[in-house]
Amino acid sequence: MIPGKGRYFFTSESVTEGHPDKVADQISDAVLDVLLAQDPMSRVACETLVTTGMAFIAGEIRTKGFADLPEVVRSTIRNIGYNSSEMGFDWKTCAVISSIDKQSGDIAQGVDRGNPEDQGAGDQGMMFGFACDETPTLMPAPIYWAHQLSQRLTQVRKDGILDFLRPDGKTQVSFEYVDGKPVHINNVVVSSQHADNVSNDTIREGIIEEVIRKTLPEGLMADDCEIFINTTGRFVIGGPMGDCGLTGRKIIQDTYGGAGHHGGGAFSGKDASKVDRSGAYMGRYIAKNVVKAGLAPKCEVQIAYCIGVAEPVSVLVSSLGSSELSDEVLTRAVREVFDLRPYHIIKRLDLNRPIYGKTTCYGHFGRELPEFTWEQCDAVADLRTAAKI
């Protein structure tokens, strides 16, 4: 997607935890975490819909644990900050409706095996991982900085620095590239829900000074960088009252901001037996280690599975033309170093833990938290040996 030569612009967006789709994602992952904490072998596929005054949870679950769904939903909404009916969503009064079934036995028989190493993939499909040398965490610059802005937008709201802000918000960053390298930011877009009776000038000044200038390093923004803030002129009605939210509708901001491919599968509410999630995490882990090892400045990994089959049906590791090493050499090295059967992915990355609430907002990739094992660069030496460099 991104050209390698010439001058061009590339844009990525991020959303805050109060965005309705992210509210849904957080509820789904909260249910998952509650069950994994009690039963690490829980099988969870939890979807959430949120709208004015209501949260609806549906899905298929097999577990020895128990989740008090109304309590999980309300505590999640409370932590986000929807605490008043004036916002159209209040953790104390919102309705919680659920329809949870058992995991299909037809699916279970394809995943469960007498020998754990033979665990089959939970579905067919392809997953992608990506890494590049544009930022310290080996993420594309546009999505990296869009997430930084979203995190700061939430921080100034929760810390009371800009006490007129409300939970819903979005950010967007456009970078100018020259010959494949990010040079500077051409424009920034920030939209934030706010209290009524606050002037646009107050909102604009506060966001520029407390969010943008305290997030983006001096010199990163072009001299003529345009800043767009709440460009409709009013953003009082937001969150689930302004838009219905659904699990799995922010898959691009969850990953690489459009800089890499996406297989289409969402992450939130799914345990690691679902290769939509574990396969994508493994893809990121591989791509990041390839770049960190110096095998390529840019790397994309595709892994594809057949439901009920342990071994992937295809694996491709590509430098997208950025490396002196061929894609064939990179792919062979990766296959030598990494076991891509679901059981071994889950074991290597320790994915049967209640860690997913931390992944939900501001990107599943590019945040080097202790729980995010897929962000570790601990396979560098093995990859260099396998690639014979």
UniProtKB/Swiss-Prot annotation:
Major location (coarse): cytoplasm
Compartment annotation: Cytoplasm
Annotated ATP binding sites: 19, 168-170, 234-235, 243, 249-250, 266, 270
Chain positions covered by the region annotation Flexible loop: 103-113
Keyword list, A-Z: ATP-binding, Cytoplasm, Magnesium, Metal-binding, Nucleotide-binding, One-carbon metabolism, Potassium, Transferase
CDD domains: S-AdoMet_synt
UniProt: Mg(2+) binding residues: 21
EC number per UniProt: 2.5.1.6
SUPFAM superfamilies: S-adenosylmethionine synthetase
Cofactor: Mg(2+); K(+)
Co-factor: note: Binds 2 divalent ions per subunit.
Catalytic reaction list: L-methionine + ATP + H2O = S-adenosyl-L-methionine + phosphate + diphosphate
GO biological process: one-carbon metabolic process; S-adenosylmethionine biosynthetic process
Enzyme class label: transferase
Record bears the keyword Magnesium: yes
Residue numbers binding L-methionine: 60, 103, 243, 274
NCBIfam families with a match to the protein in the record: metK
Function: Catalyzes the formation of S-adenosylmethionine (AdoMet) from methionine and ATP. The overall synthetic reaction is composed of two sequential steps, AdoMet formation and the subsequent tripolyphosphate hydrolysis which occurs prior to release of AdoMet from the enzyme.
Protein name per its UniProtKB record: S-adenosylmethionine synthase
